[in-house]
Amino acid sequence: MDTVIELSKLLHDEEFKDNASCTSTPTLKTARIIESAVTGITLTASVPMIIIVITTMILYHRVAKHNATSFYVITLFASDFVLMWCVFFMTVNREQLFSFNRFFCQLVYFIYHAVCSYSISMLAIIATIRYKTLHRRKQTESKTYSTGRNIGILLLASSMCAIPTALFVQINGAKKTTGKCVVYLSSPKAYELFLAVKIVFSFIW
């Protein structure tokens, strides 16, 4: 119960102190500008390419419906596409080009961490399928009945892993309603959070 009360205090900004007046060194500012520029160039080049790849994979999946891997690849590139938009929103917010409210910040961070977990897990699944196919050439990929179930389970697990980050998103700015999105996690809360994750993984294992 004490943990729930402390968590509710944190979620209502009772422990978070605004740090909008904190100054940055010239080196740090330069590094952030370079990072934002590289991110912008990467997004500009990657988004059209991913759209082309997704369109091509959808057309291929319509022709080769027996191939379950193609549907996994489509969802993988779709998650990467969503991830890039999350990176775009996080970058423009960090550079203070746009100010977001707390709900939008939580939504962006939740989707960002969820699709990151999903992409990494989906890569592992695709690699496993390709490995099994190469070593069992007589086995076909016609069993697509479990594809939707596997994707649904993976999305649910990724969303559950992204919930803690979204809960600790705060607003850092002169205004209390909008500003820069930050993830504030005090040391005691971090210890309790990772302890809970450790217990959950121990039960699962």
UniProtKB/Swiss-Prot annotation:
Gene3D superfamilies: Rhodopsin 7-helix transmembrane proteins. CDD domains: 7tm_classA_rhodopsin-like. One of its GO terms (cellular component) is host cell membrane. The chain crosses the membrane at residues 40-60, 71-91, 107-127, 151-171, 185-205. SUPFAM superfamilies: Family A G protein-coupled receptor-like. It is a multi-pass membrane protein. Pfam families: 7tm_1 (PF00001). Keywords: Disulfide bond, G-protein coupled receptor, Host membrane, Membrane, Receptor, Transducer, Transmembrane, Transmembrane helix. It is found in: Host membrane. Belongs to the G-protein coupled receptor 1 family. This is G-protein coupled receptor. The lineage of its organism: Viruses, Duplodnaviria, Heunggongvirae, Peploviricota, Herviviricetes.
